[in-house]
Amino acid sequence: MLSDGLQIFLRITKCHLIHARSCQRLVNERRFLATAPAPGLRRRVVITGIGLVTPLGVGTQLVWDRLVRGESGIVSLVGDEYQSIPCSVAAYVPRGCDEGQFNEQNFVPKSDTKSMSPPTVMAIAAAELALKDAGWHPQSEADQAATGVAIGMGMVPLEVISETALTFQTKGYSKVSPFFVPKILVNMASGQVSIRHKLKGPNHAVSTACTTGAHAVGDSFRFVAHGDADVMVAGGTDSCISPLSLAGFARARALSTNTDPKSACRPFHPQRDGFVMGEGAAVLVLEEHRHALRRGARVYAEIVGYGLSGDAGHITAPDPGGEGAFRCMAAAVKDAGIQPEEVSYINAHATSTPLGDAAENKAIKQLFKDHAHVLAVSSTKGATGHLLGTAGAAEAAFTALACYHRKLPPTLNLDCTEPHFDLNYVPLKAQEWKAENRRIALTNSFGFGGTNATLCIAGM
């Protein structure tokens, strides 16, 4: 008769063996894996869905139409709490029930919003719009396991922290919300989207200041390209317009002090004086090319390259010579396997700061040399403001839509330039994107801490 200890040991061992055999069977059946690429090959990655929650409105086509018409979502700040701050404009997502307005209850039940921060709610909305736009609603366990989420957040809403700190100090421990920590975790947007749509592939979150959205899309591109997923729901979200955050950016001398909301953000302009803070969420559905073709998906564009670099210089200021931006763009071009002369459009990071716009302009000229005077460069931030952690994802979406519609979005408010800003910045009005060969673009994102990313996106 076996001892009690030996019987327990055998039961535990048997359970582990059964579990191991079960896992091996699932792996053999490929039920929980994306399709692996052939050795030495990289899978093609296309954009099949776009969801936008921006100061220009909510949706995809509606936002694009407003962008190319030259509309702006920047408005004046209202409220006594902003009176002491030398910034009087911002770019809010329009709230309401009319077309193009954001009504969070269309996406999240009111009972659930108490456990979420505003950027998480916006990310849920943008993801739902993107998945619907892509026509991708995985139901089988295999499809769910092959679909991942990577939605970044540049910074949590500071008022969530400050208000909770005040509550704790004045009312004590028992009044602190049990949802406080989930509200301030930057990965919770990815988590909530994964939970709501049962997406069990890679679950990833990026927080790299204003480069967040581009890094999330770029990382997702590589997840799909290298077989970690067949589909990625990727993007960025930020909603932190508040007196405290505005005060912080203003003290860093990053914000525009222009009081006119229609001209405050003017990338590449001689009188640019800082960025305009915005909010929103942008999510793209990235998909392995053959996977998209098999299901008959509409394809906006293809991501063909991704580059990253670090300035290693200053905590907030860019490298004045644009070296980090140059290396980042060069890395994306190399990753795409193309020549710089094949690029015909750049969606610039250009936030309307004196240093940043000048550095990016230098980097473009350094990389493209004479070809710089042939390509088009525009910044869409004159229309949206600077969406912080959302910016890179929103601008990747705009670049994909530019490829799809063959139209270049304008740089608003650019009615004059300085002598060394002598490129085609698509001033004031949208332009037709004329190209002899494939339409290929770069979209740049640069952030505090010297973090840089460039995506190379091409038409089909």
Curated annotation (Swiss-Prot):
Residues 42-459 form the Ketosynthase family 3 (KS3) domain. The active site is at C210 (for beta-ketoacyl synthase activity), H349 (for beta-ketoacyl synthase activity), H386 (for beta-ketoacyl synthase activity). The modification N6-acetyllysine is found at K110, K175. Keywords: Acetylation, Acyltransferase, Fatty acid biosynthesis, Fatty acid metabolism, Lipid biosynthesis, Lipid metabolism, Mitochondrion, Transferase, Transit peptide. The lineage of its organism: Eukaryota, Metazoa, Chordata, Craniata, Vertebrata. Pathway: Lipid metabolism; fatty acid biosynthesis. The gene is OXSM. This is 3-oxoacyl-[acyl-carrier-protein] synthase, mitochondrial. Its EC number is 2.3.1.41. It holds the Pfam family Ketoacyl-synt_C. Signal peptide: none annotated. The modification N6-succinyllysine is found at K110, K114, K175. It comes from Bos taurus. GO terms for molecular function: 3-oxoacyl-[acyl-carrier-protein] synthase activity.
